[in-house]
Amino acid sequence: NIEQIPALIVEKEEWEGRPHPTVIFLHGFQSGKEHNLHYAYNLVNQGVRVVLPDAHLHGERDDGADFARMSANFWKIVLTSIHELKRIYTALKEEGLLMDGKVGVGGTSMGAITTYGALASYRWIDVAVAMMGNAHYELLAQGQLDYFKKKGLQLPVDQSVIDELFKMLERVDLSKHLDRLNQRPLFIWHGEQDVIVPFSVTELLMKEITPLYEGTTH
């Protein structure tokens, strides 16, 4: 565990206890840290230490929540992960495991969504990877609400809670704070046929951020 957060550290034996390029990799919705070991092994083979934490209500933190309750808590999970990223980073730094300029954050699906929020929140992230994610938090949240209404589903919260959630999301919505990218390297991948997280929103993000990277070497 790192700061009481269940996590795996995947590394070569000779890196143990030493400063080394490190990536914190975040799993998707209803997944867990062990399900992303293939990403970790590939990154380790490329010379990168990987930290795999379990998100709130996932993996070792599963409290038996069904799909409906987990879906209703989606944004709480994302916001909790953003907060916990700072705790993980601080703990790794205090243990002398990080190298200046060599700290990355990445993830798939919900993990990629969290990565975008982390980029809007933390300057210590040097490089990021987002696969099948969505940086437009308010747009995604509104789409989820519209979906629930269309299906005739009643959310177990009142409107004031929803309003407060949107205020919290605005603070970490990368699409509203693109200047916070500060031209940091960001690898984005998204399949056009994705039916869970719309590809169109990633396409929109690419159009929004491309001008911000003009003049960079890559």
Where are the language model's segments positioned?
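Short alpha-helix in the alpha/beta-hydrolase fold that links the catalytic acid
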Residues: 39, 198-209
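Conserved alpha/beta-hydrolase
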Residues: 42-66
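N-terminal cap/lid segment of alpha/beta-hydrolase-fold proteins
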Residues: 1-17
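Primarily recognizes the serine-hydrolase "nucleophile elbow" in alpha/beta-hydrolase
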Residues: 88-147
